[in-house]
Structures are given as structure tokens and as C-alpha cells.
Amino acid sequence: MRTRVIVNGANGKMGILACETLENHEQFEVVAKLSRQDNLGQSILDTKAQIVVDLTRADCVYENSLTIINHGARPVIGTSGLVETQIDELTKLCKIKQIGGIIAPNFSLGAILMMMLAAKASEYFSEVEIIEGHHQQKLDAPSGTALKTAEMMAAARKKPKNKLPLKELTPGARGGSHHDINIHSLRLPGLLARQEVLFGNIGETLSITHNSIDRRCFMPGIVLACQKVLNLTNLVYGLEHLL
């Protein structure tokens, strides 16, 4: 018997590809393709969906996640925009409900490896900044990938970065700071998703870069998340925990 999956945000570019990928996979059945005007909770009840893949927008992803969990389905969240307090609340709710879930800042294997390598490098380099770039239809900044990368590096680093007495002549020139790591966000035509983690040391720099050039690079990660979430009883933040 195939696993019943709803794709929420099915009319977007990622959603269309996700539907195509899951429909062509022997393990899954896409039982509903939802957009903004559809009733997510009622659709879960009507279809008896086991998994909801959310590929919507930052301004509704938290409410969608609550709806999915409270209606007994397992969330696979590929939408950025969740803040740490919201992730904490969703983690608690999944624990109470004994429902597995996955929040994936990035579904690309290459991007996940980039984050893991950046975390490893942070053990040796304390001076680092992140430059992320996306297409202009991405309305939130910084990206979930950049935030997750900063969190992983902050957890791995062994000494604090230097505190420089800099004065910004233009406010925001040094980017935003997350876990004491500066992040610079680009939104340009011609980009899909790109991130560079740039480390500096005396007499040298180290750059770790990932560039997504086709949304199909995210599809194996969506399949993996849908396969793994069925065996979870807790919320997992980051696909690196499932590799």
C-alpha cells in the first residue's frame, strides 16, 4: 500500500516538481495538491493523508505546520521562515502527539554537505561570514539554509570571533548577525539558490560554496524525507540528521 501524501503549495515551481516526483515513485500516492485557497486541515481529514509536504510561503508556514500536526499527519517542511521559538514549539507539539516531522532548510544533498563541511571548518576557523543569494521571488531573508548553517557553525566553533570596532557608514553594510555570524543576502535575477561560507585566517581564506542551478536537485531530499518521517516520533530539524 502506498503512503498517502499531500503537497501543499502544489502550484509553485517546487510544488509542481514535488508532485511529479512523488507521483512517479512507487512508494507514494499524492492524494491532494493544495494551494493557498484550500482548507489544509479538512483535506488531511478527507484524504487520510499520512504526510504533508509544505512548500508554501514564510508568512503561513508556522500555521500550516500546526495544522498538519494537530490533524495527525506528519509534516515535511521545505518552506523557510520559521524562527527558533516556532521550531521549539513545533518540537514540543510533535513530542506530545508522538508524531514525526522534518523541517528541512534545504533538500539538496550538496547543500547539506556544504553545511556539514562549514561546521567542521568552524572548529579551526573562528572568522567567518555567509553570503547567500536567491531569485527575486524569494521574499524572506536570510534564507533558512544560511540560518541553519550559522547555527551549525556556532555549535561547532571552539573560540569566539574577533570583536572589531567598526562603524557602518551605511546601516546594514555588514549584513545581519545570527549566532554572532554575519549573513549577507542577495536577491538577483539569474540566481536560483547559492551560498558561500567564507572563512578567514592570517594569510589565507577558505571558501565553501554550493550552487543550485536546477530545482530538481531538491527532489531526492524530498523523497528521503518522506521515507524517513514515517519512522520518526519526534521533529527533526535538518536533513543532515537523516543521512
From Swiss-Prot:
(S)-2,3,4,5-tetrahydrodipicolinate binds at residues 135, 144-145. Its EC number is 1.17.1.8. Keywords: Amino-acid biosynthesis, Cytoplasm, Diaminopimelate biosynthesis, Lysine biosynthesis, NAD, NADP, Oxidoreductase. The keyword Zinc does not apply. It is an enzyme of class 1 (oxidoreductase). The active site is at 134 (proton donor/acceptor), 138 (proton donor). Disulfide bonds: none annotated. One of its GO terms (cellular component) is cytosol. GO terms for biological process: diaminopimelate biosynthetic process; lysine biosynthetic process via diaminopimelate. It is found in: Cytoplasm. Pfam families: DapB_C, DapB_N. The keyword NAD applies. NAD(+) binds at residues 9-14, 78-80, 104-107. It catalyses: (S)-2,3,4,5-tetrahydrodipicolinate + NAD(+) + H2O = (2S,4S)-4-hydroxy-2,3,4,5-tetrahydrodipicolinate + NADH + H(+); (S)-2,3,4,5-tetrahydrodipicolinate + NADP(+) + H2O = (2S,4S)-4-hydroxy-2,3,4,5-tetrahydrodipicolinate + NADPH + H(+). GO terms for molecular function: 4-hydroxy-tetrahydrodipicolinate reductase; NAD binding; NADP binding; oxidoreductase activity, acting on CH or CH2 groups, NAD or NADP as acceptor. Coiled coil: none annotated. InterPro entries: DapB_C, DapB_N, DapB_N_CS, DHDPR_bac, NAD(P)-bd_dom_sf. Its main location: cytoplasm. Pathway: Amino-acid biosynthesis; L-lysine biosynthesis via DAP pathway; (S)-tetrahydrodipicolinate from L-aspartate: step 4/4. It comes from the Bacteria. HAMAP family: DapB. Catalyzes the conversion of 4-hydroxy-tetrahydrodipicolinate (HTPA) to tetrahydrodipicolinate. Belongs to the DapB family. This is 4-hydroxy-tetrahydrodipicolinate reductase. It comes from Legionella pneumophila (strain Lens).
